[in-house]
């Protein structure tokens, strides 16, 4: 059952009201948003520029990769829940489409507002997708226990706080964070975790639908592979052209490879009977791209990237195995997707790695490239040690914004008119979607199984089973 008639009537009205939200956004775009000089036909040709020099040709390939990651990678990574696949992909689509518009306005007012207008181009598109990524990270922490109206309100608040935090870090404190270990991963993770703590529901610990099935975990691996392949582009998307962008992609590439090996090694070590856990592989193998987010543009060295990636993969795997149960039982945080292990802890490690590498920066190591990586050091306004301290202070600022914002967001999402799904309907697609009338679940052990062969539930054939329609 999808719920009572009154609840169904409320849902019928909630999402159509999005047209008013889209209309308000469109009005703000009409008043404030304009093409920048690299996009406007008259301004570009007035400068007698060659089309080959347009920023589009340098940034758009990275934008394509980032865009695919946000809409395909994040969405499919969350389809592991056995009865929440439509919602995982569909609400990712909805949230990202709204967040990229709203963040264009928020970031525009903070970063590119001059002459009374916000000026947009391919860089603003990438920045908007970055912000949408942070929102989707937070979504992962509350996946399955929030409705679309609640999620949109979460995005409305989080995008504003994301923009303010980013402005404080990058423009006021002069923090360097090319791949977003601080601004994207740490902020998004702890915003979502505090939000989840405020929305804690003790009865959900008993839900049988919080786990994956063979086919749902397989689909989630599609998201993992998408993110794994394209993450060097994500970290390098807005770094300085030339050596900086090249170095960022290289460091991310090696860190991802090392985190994957670390994940496989630790998963087998801590797994039952030495077997791999697909949850570890889906998630912890990606921790390498988070841990080098801050330092990927710096002279981390290939060895440093490998070491950092391996450490992140092992820490993330151990987090899924040991810390997630503690997080729920002791701290009342129901972290559905394990964002603390994939984004939170690796994000903090990434910030600390950035502190170390920034503190070791010298003119000899960077040469003329110091200006593009650490402009304040190159100009003599800061020492390397001072830059490192600002990097560390940026972590505390981020945690403050994330914690306060997540707490406030949790209180807002508890408002009764937002139609939070009841405990019995959490992690269920049919609450918000016209789901098919049958689902897939594992069969009992087949009669032809070899006697004495170790039984593996994940490898059982699949059968069609009538959907559980009880409220």
UniProtKB/Swiss-Prot annotation:
GO BP annotations listed: ammonium homeostasis; ammonium transmembrane transport
Domain of life: Eukaryota
Region of interest (Disordered), residue spans: 437-471
Comp. bias (Basic and acidic residues): 452-471
Keyword Membrane annotated: yes
Membrane topology, Cytoplasmic segments: 1-13, 82-85, 145-148, 201-217, 271-280, 324-344, 413-471
Span(s) of short sequence motif Basolateral sorting signal: 427-430
Alphabetical list of InterPro entries matching this protein: Ammonium/urea_transptr, NH4_transpt_AmtB-like_dom, RhesusRHD
Subunit structure: Interacts (via C-terminus) with ANK2 and ANK3; required for targeting to the basolateral membrane.
Family, as annotated: Belongs to the ammonium transporter (TC 2.A.49) family. Rh subfamily.
Protein name from the UniProt record: Ammonium transporter Rh type B
Record organism: Pongo pygmaeus (Bornean orangutan)
Species classification: Eukaryota, Metazoa, Chordata, Craniata, Vertebrata
